[in-house]
Structures are given as structure tokens and as C-alpha cells.
Amino acid sequence: GDTFDLGDVTIEVIHTPGHTRGHSIFLVPEAKTVYLGDIELTGFGPYYGDAWSSLIDFEKSLELCRNIDAENFVTFHHKWVITGRADFINQLDNFEKVINDREEKMLDFLKKPRTLDDCVAHRFVYRPHVELAFADSVERRCAEQHLNRMIQDGRVQSAEHKRFVSI
């Protein structure tokens, strides 16, 4: 990525796609500080529900973040500043675990054949009572990404009538 030289300080731009195609984080090596943007470490977990989001890219970006040499980690939402690498790694682990949790819940739900619409209605990202205009489209994009991966991994298969079932 690019590096901005501001005199006594440099800012390194590190491309971390997943949340969006162009998502980047900004490392200030002299301050051992990284601005994580929308890698926000909340209990909601990674958001990869936009049209240009990618679950696979997000996971690669989280691995990249795990290896950044920093002591201060600044998020865009809710957490703000996390001081100390051990605390950051713990929060990153919890944040990343949400992906696995969603997938495990989906596998359990797919013990009976279900359609994509069934998965959307069940809500694996948002809680069932959350009424947001965009919630169904986010659920659909996230479910499609998980289903595609689980089909490729052999954990889910297509069934009749456009249904999916866990193996």
C-alpha cells in the first residue's frame, strides 16, 4: 500500500478487503498505532453483508491484522482505542469467532432442508426482532456466502426445490 510521509510521522495504508473491496487500515509505525476502520471488534462480529463485501477476504484481512506490529488499536465503532497487543488479540479472536458461530448455527438449522429465503427469515446476522429496511438483503448476502463456502467444503449440499441441507 501507499505510505504518507508527514515529516516526523508516516502512515502506511494496508489494504484489508472484506467489509468492502476497498477497506484499508492505517498504521502509524512510530506510534505503534493502527486505525482499524470497520474491523471494529464488537460482539456483532464482522460485517460482510454489502454487495461488494467478501467473507473470504474478511477472514484473510483479520489474519493480516493479527500480524501487525502495533500496541494501540483504534476502531471506528464502539470500542475506540484498545491498548496492548494481548487485549487486541483476545478481542480479535472473539470478533472472528462470530463467523464460525454463524456458520455452526446455520449448519444446525440446515439439518432439515431449507431454502435461502428460510435462512434469511431465520436471521443469522441480525436478531429476529430487529426491523431494519436493509436487514433481509444483508442476511441474504451473508447466507449466500456461507452456503457457497459450506457447499464447496462438503458440509452442505443442494436438495430438491432449491433447498439446502447439512451433510
Predicted feature locations:
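Conserved hydrophobic "DFG−1" position in protein kinase catalytic cores
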Residues: L6, F26-V28, S158, S166
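Alpha-helix-centered segments that form part of catalytic cores
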Residues: G1-V9
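Generic structural signal for secondary-structure transition and capping sites
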Residues: T3, A70, R114-T115
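Metallo-beta-lactamase
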Residues: T10-E103
